[in-house]
Amino acid sequence: MNRLAVEIPGLSLKNPIMPASGCFGFGQEYSKYYDLNELGAIMAKAVTPEPRLGNPTPRVAETASGMLNAIGLQNPGLEHVLAHELPFLEQFETPIIANVAGATEDDYVQVCARIGESKAVKAIELNISCPNVKHGGIAFGTDPDVAHRLTKAVKNVATVPVYVKLSPNVADIVSIAQAIEAAGADGLTMINTLLGMRIDLKTRKPIIANGTGGLSGPAIKPVAIRMIHQVREVSNIPIIGMGGVQTVDDVLEFLIAGADAVAVGTMNFTDPFICPKLISELPKRMDELGISSLQELKKERANQ
């Protein structure tokens, strides 16, 4: 038996580690450095119905223990991704999780109805942190009713399991998770970035042209651990955890908190080899901690 294997809806993972969406493109650049078949899965870059140029620059800023970004979901659009990006990934056995974003409910439905046309795509990650342009720009993921309705609409058309990515910029993460689960979501991914800002002392203005950006990296890990633990306390829904993963101990901390698998984001920019490194280090660290397999760790967590 593979002691690192994880089985969650649509995804048979040889190990629990994958690159997070937005930090890995569509895999072509990283494939020059290592075999993508080593990965548990790949969370591809966000896709919208039409191409998007993203936000004006500067749109990235370094922070203590992390970074801010306001890329603005820059991507070549659904048709290009189906024709040129996903076919490249079909050569690998690694399951692909397609990240889907939009400005309206119709945008999400349009992409989710078709993204499964690629045989590489085994699941969808629904990015509900996007602003809803028909409701004053409030993010889809901050209102339980809106999140429920969007999840249900997508589940009606999706041909693969749907995982919904939770925003941490909410007062009650549990109520959002419960609303999404009630709508039929197959799983959750959590957490997305926290809203942040940096000021340039010389210009007296925000460094990010957009004003604010998403804070990621080690700074947000305690928030991610807390939120995953809160959701796991009330639900058995599959969770892919993320937010500040740097080390193999971080991976295990996420799994013990309640995640079934773990995604690595910002660290890919610091060390392109971070995912295969963590995968190779995980068995030894499990031995040191007396963890026979991830399946046993999950049972232990359930019995606590």
UniProtKB/Swiss-Prot annotation:
Q: What is this enzyme's EC?
A: 1.3.1.14
Report the transmembrane regions from the record: none
Name it.
Dihydroorotate dehydrogenase B (NAD(+)), catalytic subunit
Query: Which amino acids does the record list as binding FMN?
Result: 21, 45-46, 99, 127, 165, 191, 217, 243-244, 265-266
Q: Which GO terms describe its cellular component?
A: cytoplasm
What Pfam families does the record tag this protein with? Answer: DHO_dh
Q: Which GO terms describe its biological process?
A: 'de novo' pyrimidine nucleobase biosynthetic process; 'de novo' UMP biosynthetic process
Q: Which reactions fall under this protein's catalytic activity?
A: (S)-dihydroorotate + NAD(+) = orotate + NADH + H(+)
Give the primary localization class.
cytoplasm
Give the required cofactors: FMN
Subunit structure, as described in the record:
Heterotetramer of 2 PyrK and 2 PyrD type B subunits.
Q: What are the catalytic residues?
A: 130
Where it sits in the cell: the answer is: Cytoplasm
Chain residues that bind substrate: 45, 69-73, 127, 192-193
How the cofactor is bound: the record states:
Binds 1 FMN per subunit.
| Keyword field | Cytoplasm, Flavoprotein, FMN, NAD, Oxidoreductase, Pyrimidine biosynthesis
Question: Which family is it part of?
Answer: Belongs to the dihydroorotate dehydrogenase family. Type 1 subfamily.
Q: State the protein's purpose.
A: Catalyzes the conversion of dihydroorotate to orotate with NAD(+) as electron acceptor.
Q: Which domain of life is it from?
A: Bacteria
Functional pathway: Pyrimidine metabolism; UMP biosynthesis via de novo pathway; orotate from (S)-dihydroorotate (NAD(+) route): step 1/1
Q: Example GO molecular function term?
A: dihydroorotate dehydrogenase (NAD+) activity
